[in-house]
């Protein structure tokens, strides 16, 4: 075979293989959704474009899932500096500031809280139909003190704004405001309205369950979780969230374990419920049930996906294992 002919055959082979490589190479979002934090970091840090806004935002979100707030902030600030008009980037920067504020001393927490609400407001102003930003802003308004920009009046104004296009979300905001103001009957009416408007979705039932948990209304809490899990409009992440609530209340741990296993083995996991953290939560459930051996196996499964996830490392250490 002549050299030119060989060269053409090699070129043709490369052209045929390139689409296959493109299909098999995981994208950052796919790795986030499947909970492969270590692999996502390797991909993003090794990419030639790792300093562009999109990659910086993904790095922020990976570190956020790992509860590494300092690195999350660093990369989110880089993304926002490159593209300040991106609502998604502003939202994730606000979330990172908020989480850092929750573990900071009062002076730093005050400054970070101000940054948090500023980012949420910018994100909402950039895209008023982007409900994750609107909901985070509403939650901030109903939970933060006025000195750092909170206020039920602001939450209710936001609810009125989004109500025409997003009535269920608006009812949820009104429920949060009523709960914050100490009006439990009104809060429950609005939670019920959110459930009705969202056609009995599991997510809205879990919003009500979260409220009932805070009021220590345990029987109704358990009933509401059950209704959420029986909803025809249930998403895989709803099972994760229900299991976490059951774990935190130390109620019905058998069900919590089943829900986490169902989520881990589903084909539709997501960034909002990291798979490595589902393994960690399952380990916590099993430990509380007295099965330290299986708990350790779940902690290790979490670390296999996210080797820097400190809660799993600490949990193994408490069990006297590595």
Residue positions per predicted region:
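Short coil/linker segments at helix-helix boundaries
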Residues: 31, 67-81, 85, 89-129, ...
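Structural marker of alpha-solenoid helical repeat scaffolds
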Residues: 49-50, 82, 126, 162-165, ...
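Residue-level recognition of tetratricopeptide repeat
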Residues: 29, 52-54, 61, 86, 95, 102, 130, 167-169, ...
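Canonical tetratricopeptide repeat
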Residues: 58-61, 92, 136, 173, ...
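Alpha-helical adaptor scaffolds
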Residues: 29, 139, 143, 210-214, ...
């Amino acid at each position: 075979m002549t050299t030119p002919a060989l060269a053409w055959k090699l070129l043709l082979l490369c052209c045929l293989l390139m689409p296959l490589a493109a299909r098999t190479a995981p994208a950052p979002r796919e790795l986030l959704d499947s909970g492969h934090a270590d692999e996502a970091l390797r991909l993003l840090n090794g990419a030639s474009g790792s300093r562009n806004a999109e990659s910086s935002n993904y790095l922020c979100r990976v570190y956020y899932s790992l509860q590494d707030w300092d690195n999350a902030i660093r990369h989110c600030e880089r993304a926002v500096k490159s593209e300040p008009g991106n609502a998604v980037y502003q939202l994730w920067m606000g979330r990172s500031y908020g989480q850092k504020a929750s573990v900071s001393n009062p002076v730093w927490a005050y400054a970070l809280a101000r940054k948090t609400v500023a980012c949420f407001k910018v994100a909402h102003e950039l895209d008023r139909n982007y409900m994750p930003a609107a909901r985070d802003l509403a939650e901030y308004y109903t939970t933060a003190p006025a000195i750092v920009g909170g206020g039920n009046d602001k939450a209710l104004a936001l609810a009125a704004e989004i109500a025409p296009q997003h009535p269920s979300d608006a009812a949820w905001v009104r429920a949060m405001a009523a709960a914050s103001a100490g009006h439990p009957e009104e809060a429950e009416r609005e939670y019920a309205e959110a459930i009705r408007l969202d056609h009995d979705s599991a997510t809205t039932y879990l919003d009500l369950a979260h409220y009932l948990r805070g009021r220590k209304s345990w029987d109704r809490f358990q009933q509401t979780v059950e209704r959420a899990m029986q909803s025809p409009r249930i998403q895989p992440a709803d099972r994760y969230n229900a299991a976490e609530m059951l774990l935190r209340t130390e109620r019905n741990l058998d069900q919590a374990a089943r829900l986490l296993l169902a989520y881990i083995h589903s084909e539709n996991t997501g960034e909002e419920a990291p798979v490595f953290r589902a393994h960690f939560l399952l380990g916590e459930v099993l430990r509380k049930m007295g099965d330290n051996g299986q708990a350790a196996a779940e902690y290790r499964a979490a670390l296999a996906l996210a080797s820097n996830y400190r809660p799993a490392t600490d949990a193994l250490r408490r069990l006297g294992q590595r």
